[in-house]
Curated annotation (Swiss-Prot):
<dbReference type="InterPro" id="IPR029044">
    <property type="entry name" value="Nucleotide-diphossugar_trans"/>
</dbReference>
<feature type="binding site">
    <location>
        <position position="420"/>
    </location>
    <ligand>
        <name>acetyl-CoA</name>
    </ligand>
</feature>
<feature type="binding site">
    <location>
        <position position="101"/>
    </location>
    <ligand>
        <name>Mg(2+)</name>
    </ligand>
</feature>
<feature type="region of interest" description="Pyrophosphorylase">
    <location>
        <begin position="1"/>
        <end position="226"/>
    </location>
</feature>
<feature type="binding site">
    <location>
        <begin position="383"/>
        <end position="384"/>
    </location>
    <ligand>
        <name>acetyl-CoA</name>
    </ligand>
</feature>
<feature type="binding site">
    <location>
        <position position="374"/>
    </location>
    <ligand>
        <name>UDP-N-acetyl-alpha-D-glucosamine</name>
    </ligand>
</feature>
<feature type="binding site">
    <location>
        <position position="363"/>
    </location>
    <ligand>
        <name>UDP-N-acetyl-alpha-D-glucosamine</name>
    </ligand>
</feature>
<feature type="binding site">
    <location>
        <position position="377"/>
    </location>
    <ligand>
        <name>acetyl-CoA</name>
    </ligand>
</feature>
<dbReference type="InterPro" id="IPR025877">
    <property type="entry name" value="MobA-like_NTP_Trfase"/>
</dbReference>
<dbReference type="GO" id="GO:0016020">
    <property type="term" value="C:membrane"/>
</dbReference>
<feature type="binding site">
    <location>
        <position position="73"/>
    </location>
    <ligand>
        <name>UDP-N-acetyl-alpha-D-glucosamine</name>
    </ligand>
</feature>
<feature type="binding site">
    <location>
        <position position="224"/>
    </location>
    <ligand>
        <name>Mg(2+)</name>
    </ligand>
</feature>
<keyword id="KW-0479">Metal-binding</keyword>
<feature type="binding site">
    <location>
        <position position="136"/>
    </location>
    <ligand>
        <name>UDP-N-acetyl-alpha-D-glucosamine</name>
    </ligand>
</feature>
<feature type="binding site">
    <location>
        <begin position="8"/>
        <end position="11"/>
    </location>
    <ligand>
        <name>UDP-N-acetyl-alpha-D-glucosamine</name>
    </ligand>
</feature>
<keyword id="KW-0963">Cytoplasm</keyword>
<dbReference type="InterPro" id="IPR011004">
    <property type="entry name" value="Trimer_LpxA-like_sf"/>
</dbReference>
């Protein structure tokens, strides 16, 4: 079975009170539409067709990709009209219709729905609700067959008592779709062409309307305002927390933990409160992450410890290494096995060898640090000359005294030492001491200034 997917994403979202198109509002660091596209791709369709309207340029700019076909709906005349705009591009046997503001839909749910489709049967995703206000109602005949969907505003009191709601998500045999869309009318309370009207047409044409339901009603929850958006965010985060805990992660408080990307975890990982994981993060076995940390696009090898209030981005932390508290590792930072980065240390494009130590109050940028080298407090690499970046290279077993300025490009070779307070501008040979500071003078008879009285 070949598959085309149509994603409706043309709505304005006035209740968001935002210049940003509704479908671009984020859930867990990705736009709502981005989540839907991600799910659609996992179904391996022949084509993904995104119907856009309000804020079309912004949607294209943020989400443009070779596998997406953007279709313009100039006037928002209803869901049926929106799907009709994509008709000329549809070539597959089956068409699945999704919504750009329903980001939590699970691929497993969509797969079950697609299994219900054949040339004489379409699949409709419905949901059981305690309060179906606002949802179209699923109308069944005396044999429990779906015969129509009635929108809430058009429903009678008896129909409003129905608790089975329409999610809007359906999969249909493509051979019938053009005919059904061509027969739609806008003779309703909204004056729109409802996609839901094709259900009654299908039933009247003798097709079976087979229904599926999500395991979790929040899968089909959309967001029309900021409150609903926050509810989707919290539900997504709790879902991710449950997934990670099932994989062997201890979360001190699942309600105070956020995932905003893709996280791969090992076993016996401990994550404290207020930790944010962004982008692609790999966390191997026995890692400990302290409170209030942000980790983005990074890999933490087995046994890594990240202490409180650290920010790690684009970094690789080797087995048994540690960072923090209050450490900042910027993109390109690599810690070798058992390397140590302490409090108020910032690394950028710096490679620390196995067992290297940078204890505190240090900046290392564009630097190669050898194994077992120790960097004293207050050391900085002066790597930028105002136009270009330059590299600092320290060999193995180097000892850098406190309050050093290492003016790049400079090499300090194996076993060398630099004296505290030095400004190193020349290479230091192996096993030698580099001293680059003014000689101290003690002035005999010097008197400390006395404060002048204002009287």
């Amino acid at each position: 079975m070949s598959l085309d997917i149509v994603i409706l994403a043309a709505g304005q979202g006035t209740r968001m009170r935002s210049a940003l198109p509704k479908v671009l509002h984020p859930v867990a660091g990705n736009s709502m539409l981005g989540h839907v596209i991600h799910s659609a791709r996992q179904l391996s369709p022949s084509g993904i067709h995104v119907v856009i309207g309000h804020g079309a340029d912004a949607v294209r700019e943020q989400l443009s990709a070779d596998d997406l076909n953007f279709v313009m709906q100039d006037k928002q005349l209803g869901t049926g009209h929106a799907v009709a705009q994509a008709l000329p591009a549809l070539t597959a046997d089956t068409v699945l219709i999704l919504y750009g503001d329903v980001p939590l839909i699970e691929v497993e749910t969509l797969s079950r729905l697609l299994e219900r489709v054949n040339p004489q049967q379409l699949g409709l995703l419905t949901v059981a609700l305690d309060d179906p206000t606002g949802y179209g109602r699923i109308v069944r005949d005396d044999q429990n067959r779906v015969c129509a969907i009635v929108e809430h505003k058009d429903a009678s009191d008896a129909q409003k008592a129905i608790t089975e709601g329409n999610t809007g998500i359906l999969a249909v045999p493509a051979a019938h779709l053009a005919d059904w869309l061509g027969r739609l009318s806008n003779n309703n309370a909204q004056g729109e062409y409802y996609l839901t009207d094709v259900i009654a047409m299908a039933a009247n044409d003798g097709l079976v309307v087979a229904t599926e339901q999500p395991h979790d009603a929040m899968e089909v929850q959309g967001a029309n305002d900021r409150k609903q958006l926050s509810e989707l965010e919290r539900h997504y985060q709790m879902r991710e927390a449950r997934r990670l805990m099932a994989a062997g992660v201890t979360l001190r408080d699942p309600a105070r933990f956020d995932v905003r990307g893709e996280v791969i975890v090992g076993r016996d990982v401990l994550i404290d409160i207020n930790v944010i994981l962004e982008g692609k993060v790999v966390i191997e076995d026995d890692v400990v992450i302290g409170p209030n940390c942000v980790i983005k696009d990074s890999t933490l090898r087995k046994g890594v410890v990240v202490k409180a209030n650290s920010h790690i981005e684009g970094a690789i932390l080797g087995e048994g290494s540690d960072a923090g508290p209050f450490a900042r590792l910027r993109p390109g930072s690599v810690l070798g096995a058992k390397a140590h980065v302490g409090n108020f240390v910032e690394l950028k494009n710096a490679n620390l060898g196995e067992g290297a130590k940078v204890g505190h109050l240090t900046y290392l940028g564009d630097a190669e640090i050898g194994a077992r080298t120790n960097i004293g407090a207050g050391t900085i690499t002066c790597n930028y000359d105002g136009a270009n970046k330059h590299k600092t290279t320290l060999g193995a077993d180097v000892f850098i005294g406190s309050n050093n300025s290492l003016v790049a490009p400079v090499d300090i070779l194996d076993g060398a030492t630099t004296a505290a307070g030095s400004t190193i501008t020349q290479n230091v040979p192996a096993e030698q001491l580099g001293v680059a500071r003014a000689r101290q003078r003690n002035i005999e008879g010097w008197k400390r200034p006395v404060k002048i009285s204002k009287d």
